Amino acid sequence: MARPMGKLPSNTRKCAQCAMAEALLEIAGQTINQKDLGRSGRMTRTDNDTWDLASSVGATATMIATARALASRAENPLINDPFAEPLVRAVGIDLFTRLASGELRLEDIGDHATGGRWMIDNIAIRTKFYDDFFGDATTAGIRQVVILAAGLDTRAYRLPWPPGTVVYEIDQPAVIKFKTRALANLNAEPNAERHAVAVDLRNDWPTALKNAGFDPARPTAFSAEGLLSYLPPQGQDRLLDAITALSAPDSRLATQSPLVLDLAEEDEKKMRMKSAAEAWRERGFDLDLTELIYFDQRNDVADYLAGSGWQVTTSTGKELFAAQGLPPFADDHITRFADRRYISAVLK
């Protein structure tokens, strides 16, 4: 899931106890910072950078899988991902392995109970949103599914797909190869016809998808979970345009819209992320999220899709929390992240 910021004020040091939660908020919320709108050159990434599940963007997939493992063990869990913990263990990042297994608690890395509980609930809500999206799509008769930037997503294995469903997973070659091998070692069997498509989404993935058997004449359910902030603005537009071009009428798309923060929120966020990075580094894990995400101004996702012929529905994190009867939290910063929008759309 840091750039020098000077000495942290006392209230931020106190909030730094939320290290793990803050980083997961950053990943799940896909933050765009108002101060950085219109700026470029802030990234250390390159146009053709690659990664595995223990480095760079790939490590964030392992972090989210860690959170799914924790959410699956929660009292009255909203989700059940039995593959999350063994996959995290297979990746081998010690910090995440110990957290996912329960050997290390969030509190052990300085995370107070409220932030930790919110983080677990947040990932559960996000996961359930996409689980329900696919359930609704298949209930409507869709039998072709595309999971973009699949990472350690195990929906092909854990969701009850109707007979005849075909699931295409797209991600970088090293990620696809690792997950496929790790799940085979667990003797896991997919519940649908699964096709792993090893291609970078910045390359010609539509051709690779069609070469794997994808039929653009059939309605499809696409997901782009926690993805858009890892693409430059033009890349986001190209991705959405490609999805539209591949979509037959009645196709569906689920994604998240990056959250725009004002200047004060931007400064506080950087301080919190600095605390998270320091806490991780003390545990032997070195990752600076500010080097992974593109901060440049981009088109509003909901508006862009609507302009391309999609019928768009949005829900905030707050609304999804309330729908599950989960309590709000007093921390204003955490509550702000619950304003992020979850988007589902149908092509008409």
UniProtKB/Swiss-Prot annotation:
Pfam short name (any one): LCM
Top-level class of the enzyme under EC nomenclature: transferase
Record field: transmembrane: none
EC number: 2.1.1.-
InterPro entries reported in the protein's UniProt record: Ppm1/Ppm2/Tcmp, SAM-dependent_MTases_sf, SAM_mthyl_Trfase_ML2640-like
Molecular functions per Gene Ontology: methyltransferase activity
Keyword Zinc: no
Keywords recorded for this protein, A-Z: Methyltransferase, S-adenosyl-L-methionine, Transferase
GO BP annotations listed: methylation
Keyword Transferase in record: yes
List of residues binding S-adenosyl-L-methionine: 171, 200-201
Top-level taxon of the source organism: Bacteria
SUPFAM superfamilies: S-adenosyl-L-methionine-dependent methyltransferases
Residues annotated as signal peptide: none
Protein family per UniProt: Belongs to the UPF0677 family.
PANTHER family with a match to the protein in the record: S-ADENOSYL-L-METHIONINE-DEPENDENT METHYLTRANSFERASE YKTD-RELATED (PTHR43619), S-ADENOSYL-L-METHIONINE-DEPENDENT METHYLTRANSFERASES SUPERFAMILY PROTEIN (PTHR43619:SF2)
NCBIfam families reported in the protein's UniProt record: mthyl_TIGR00027
Function noted in UniProt: Exhibits S-adenosyl-L-methionine-dependent methyltransferase activity.
Name the record gives this protein: Putative S-adenosyl-L-methionine-dependent methyltransferase MRA_3439
Taxonomic source organism: Mycobacterium tuberculosis (strain ATCC 25177 / H37Ra)
Phylogenetic lineage: Bacteria, Bacillati, Actinomycetota, Actinomycetes, Mycobacteriales
